[in-house]
Amino acid sequence: MSEQELLDIFDARANMEAMLVSLAIARGGDEWEADVLAKAHLLSKLEACDASEKMLDEWDLRHQAFHTAIVAGCGSYYLLQMRERLFDLAARYRFIWLRRTVLSV
C-alpha cells in the first residue's frame, strides 16, 4: 500500500466517522447514549493502567468498541458496513501507531 493510499483511507475514515457521529447524535436515543458512556468508562479504566504489550490487544478492543458505540446510533446498516471496511483497511497501520503512542508511555 502506498503512502497516498494510506492517507486516502484515513481521510475517508475520518470523514465517514464525522458524518456517522452527526447522524448518531440526531438519531440516537437514551440507550445509545448510555452505551457510549459505558464504553467510554471501560476504555478509561484501561487507560489508567500501565501500558504494556499484553495490554495492547485489550486497549484496541475497548477503543474499537467505544468508536463503534459512538456511531451505532446513526441508524444506517450500510453506512456502518462501509465504516467497518475502512476501519479494517486501516487496522495494520493502527497497530503500528498504537505501539508508537500507547506503548511508548
Label the predicted regions.
Residues I96-V105:
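C-terminal regulatory/effector modules of DNA-binding transcriptional regulators
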Residues S2, C49-S52, S104:
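Serine/threonine-rich low-complexity intrinsically disordered regions
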Residues R13, D30-I96:
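Conserved amphipathic alpha-helical segments that form helical-bundle/coiled-coil interaction surfaces
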Residues M1-A26:
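Short linear motifs at protein or domain termini
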